[in-house]
Amino acid sequence: MLLKDCSIVLISTAATNIGLSNHELICSAKAGIEGLSRSAAKTYSRKNIRVNTISPGLTRTPLSRSITENTIALKASEKMHALNRVGEPKDISNMIVYLLNKENNWITGQNFIIDGGLSTTK
């Protein structure tokens, strides 16, 4: 059964927009996700399927523990963000909920950078 009248949110990374040392693999993979999102938004618009991407900055998750549980690394990372902190899962999930809401049905093919100002400080 094909989907229709729904929303898909893909996850990229803010690093694709600024270029960070030692992030070549994730940036190249996530840039592909952004292209997929834009193309899928166009392809599936006829089924009223909206496709968007969010690009978070560093967010406190199990995957980022090596940074967020290391005091020195955490302080350095916080300084990279204009809001002087790393993101929390709720910072990201709020935007996902917004994009999935059927009331917001005029948004498709977009990439939303949710990075606490990381991309503005580089």
Q: Residue ranges of each PLM-predicted region?
A:
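Active-site "substrate specificity/gating" loop of NAD(P)-dependent dehydrogenases
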Residues: 19-23, 45-46
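Alpha-helical segment proximal to the catalytic Tyr-Lys
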Residues: 42-46, 105
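Short C-terminal tail/terminal secondary-structure segment
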Residues: 18, 97, 108-122
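Active-site helix of classical SDR
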Residues: 29, 37
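A conserved structural motif in NAD(P)-dependent oxidoreductases
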Residues: 81-92
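Short, flexible catalytic-loop segment of classical short-chain dehydrogenase/reductase
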Residues: 51, 56-66
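A short C-terminal helix-loop "cap" of Rossmann-like NAD(P)-dependent dehydrogenase/epimerase domains
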Residues: 67-81
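Residue(s) in the substrate-gating loop at a strand-loop-helix junction
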Residues: 13
